[in-house]
From Swiss-Prot:
Protein name stated in the entry: ATP synthase gamma chain
GO BP terms, alphabetized: proton motive force-driven plasma membrane ATP synthesis
CDD domains on file: F1-ATPase_gamma (cd12151)
Subcellular location(s) of the protein: Cell inner membrane
Function: Produces ATP from ADP in the presence of a proton gradient across the membrane. The gamma chain is believed to be important in regulating ATPase activity and the flow of protons through the CF(0) complex.
Keywords assigned by UniProt, alphabetized: ATP synthesis, Cell inner membrane, Cell membrane, CF(1), Hydrogen ion transport, Ion transport, Membrane, Transport
């Protein structure tokens, strides 16, 4: 049984930890609001751009279609761009994204496909490296980035397009976590090269408007598709930041509550043990007095 001194030290230690988790919860809450606003602001733009591109794509067929839209005509080599957080202490946020990417990679490998991986964020890279170290061809470090900007996504997009033009892969899938609420972040896989069938369906439901394009649709697609790839990556990164802050706020709130419960239990144990010690000392005093 621990001594009273040990119990006092443990209570003090847990209280210090509770202050840290409470502070981290408040910081995450402050960052969450800005991150959520940024993610929600990016959604309409990225969704509308995808719909416009899909609408234009309906007017471009055959040899006129850009390679980024038409693809290579093969399905042999897959590139997975896995976006996670640079830091932990956010519950299962990173592991859920990594698990989705891992399961997808396993499925492709079981089908005899070739898989290549680009990791964005340290935590996801650490998880995937345990099983797919030889498949990771590049890692993007955003740890020193204080304010996420479009240029960071654009650099990743250019890297992906460069690999595609070099014939390094046939299909590219983006993995991230879509922010729904503080307690709900949904791991998501989005095919960005070639354009997925979902984009075409989105265009078909966009309305019956008829557009005239200047210059020709093929030229517009050649310019907009590379930018759309960067836009989709930027949206994924913004969704991730919001999801990370939401998960961190929830995790630190749980940690703070658990610390409070532990302090209560330790305090009860301390008080009982102290009471027992006082009772024992009183009995010894009374026994000594009676002996006299």
């Amino acid at each position: 049984m621990p001594s009273l001194k040990d119990l006092r030290n443990r209570i003090a230690s847990v209280k210090a930890t509770q202050k840290i988790t409470k502070a981290m919860q408040m910081v995450a809450a402050a960052k969450l609001r800005r991150a959520q606003e940024a993610a929600e602001a990016a959604r309409p733009y990225s969704q509308r751009m995808g719909a416009v591109l899909a609408n234009i794509a309906q007017n471009v067929t055959g040899e006129d279609a850009p390679a980024l839209m038409a693809g290579t005509g093969k399905d042999d080599v897959h590139l997975l761009v896995v976006c996670t957080a640079e830091r932990g202490l956010c519950g299962g946020f990173n592991s859920q994204i990594a698990r989705l990417a891992r399961d997808h990679a396993r499925k492709l490998l079981a089908e005899g496909k070739t898989v290549k991986i680009i990791t964005v964020g340290k935590k996801g890279a650490d998880i995937l490296r345990r099983e797919f170290a030889s498949l990771i061809i590049d890692h993007v470090n955003l740890r020193e980035v204080k304010q996420l900007a479009f240029v960071h996504a654009d650099q990743i997009g250019h890297k992906v397009i460069e690999l595609f033009e070099q014939g390094e892969f046939d299909v590219c899938t983006l993995f991230y976590s879509e922010f729904k609420s503080v307690i709900a972040q949904i791991p998501t896989a989005q095919q960005i090269i070639p354009a997925s069938a979902g984009d075409v369906a989105q265009a078909e439901t966009a309305g019956d408007a008829i557009y005239e394009y200047e210059p020709d649709p093929a030229a517009i697609l050649s310019t907009l598709i590379p930018r759309n790839i960067s836009v989709q990556i930027f949206r994924a990164l913004l969704e991730n930041v919001a999801g990370e802050m939401g998960a961190k706020m929830s995790a630190m709130d749980n940690a703070t509550r658990n610390a409070g419960d532990m302090i209560n239990k330790l305090s009860i144990t301390y008080n009982r043990q102290r009471q027992a010690q006082i009772t024992k000392e009183l009995i010894e005093i009374i026994s000594g007095a009676e002996a006299l």
